[in-house]
């Protein structure tokens, strides 16, 4: 997505949350008018409590831990495995920041090594990189052959929020 669109997914997420026309924005303001802005403060690391964004965007965040375990499972490798439960049990909050007890350091080291091995053995593997390029080329060609105008903004790097949520499997394949 980012390779074609040239916009980071974090920025796209913030744009969608703040756009009054999106379903997510409408759902959030039903709960609290300030909720969209508060979520964006967390996503952009501007929240007053660092712990709030460290959980979702740091070297030891939920997203990284999730995709490592999920990708290790999906690829059938053991490279991305680490002791998630142990890490979670040893996490602490100190001065509004996330910390790890010393007894959890070996689990953190395993996590770091899992990331290292997954990058070198899976994510940066020549086959994986060539598939990435082939998928990009497929979408470019598919959009031309099917004359799908909804792909134009993506391929031109000018994708609006409306264009983004119009890109669904129905428009692609039917």
Question: Over which residues does each language-model region extend?
Answer:
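Histidine-centered, transition-metal-coordinating active-site segments
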Residues: 2-174
